[in-house]
Amino acid sequence: MIEFGNFYQLIAKNHLSHWLETLPAQIAAWQREQQHGLFKQWSNAVEFLPEITPWRLDLLHSVTAESETPLSEGQLKRIDTLLRNLMPWRKGPFSLYGVDIDTEWRSDWKWDRVLPHLSDLTGRTILDVGCGSGYHLWRMIGAGAHLAVGIDPTQLFLCQFEAVRKLLGNDQRAHLLPLGIEQLPALKAFDTVFSMGVLYHRRSPLEHLWQLKDQLVNEGELVLETLVVDGDENTVLVPGDRYAQMRNVYFIPSAPALKKWLEKCGFIDVRIADVCVTTTEEQRRTEWMVTESLADFLNPNDRSKTVEGYPAPQRAVLIARKP
């Protein structure tokens, strides 16, 4: 059973304590009403994992845990089997006592692109919206964050996060809540808010930007990473039924248009930090994610186009500040 009591106790003692006015009731409702049909199977996989305290833990350069003496073949097989019960693994990679989870996305590459542009994370309280399995939460802790909170309603991601946490010695510096941002009150409590790979899934992208702003303290920093297209500040792609085989893609602006959106929502010091094309080396099928991936979503005769004929995915990182 995945519990959230440790998080409640933690925030009761800090500037997030006002969140306790709504959060426990929301989580209780989720536990009663909204659990996925496979959730018990997934949570059992987490429960059956061994409790291990790492001898060496690296969250600065990767997410890697090692034991002082190698685990037995039986222990490794048990961990490997239980983690494979939580497939597909999309965001990573993780290296846990000799079990290497080669995820669909090289999320470490994204982190390497983003990190040089951030304000120092040391001592910060961070919110990561749409955090997936929580890979970047651990990297935020490795970069010095005091507390990293992720929200993502996908319940498999919650179980993946809790599995990794257990194998990292039940580390309580990062937490994942099975919520969407629309369920959060205007906390105005986070020093840095990340939204990476979310905006294009929102029917109302400007509303999403306002929601992100409502989570930041004054002078707080927003890190926004999303799909973009080439063009000027008036360029926005509105795909038809699908984009790269995804149904739930609504608006893909140019980076200059996105900068304008952020300014319209009241952010200041907005800058385009990075723009890069997503490659089939960064997003691909692996033995931990065996279904279709980026290579299957591109036109086989013209890799600069999706199968629908749109520009192939490229992603931008924008940094902005709440006044």
Curated annotation (Swiss-Prot):
It comes from Salmonella schwarzengrund (strain CVM19633). Catalyzes carboxymethyl transfer from carboxy-S-adenosyl-L-methionine (Cx-SAM) to 5-hydroxyuridine (ho5U) to form 5-carboxymethoxyuridine (cmo5U) at position 34 in tRNAs. It is an enzyme of class 2 (transferase). Carboxy-S-adenosyl-L-methionine binds at residues 91, 105, 110, 130, 152-154, 181-182, 196, 200, 315. Its EC number is 2.5.1.-. Belongs to the class I-like SAM-binding methyltransferase superfamily. CmoB family. It comes from the Bacteria. It holds the Pfam family Methyltransf_9. This is tRNA U34 carboxymethyltransferase. One of its GO terms (biological process) is tRNA wobble uridine modification. It catalyses: carboxy-S-adenosyl-L-methionine + 5-hydroxyuridine(34) in tRNA = 5-carboxymethoxyuridine(34) in tRNA + S-adenosyl-L-homocysteine + H(+). InterPro entries: CmoB (IPR010017), Mo5U34_MeTrfas-like (IPR027555), SAM-dependent_MTases_sf (IPR029063).
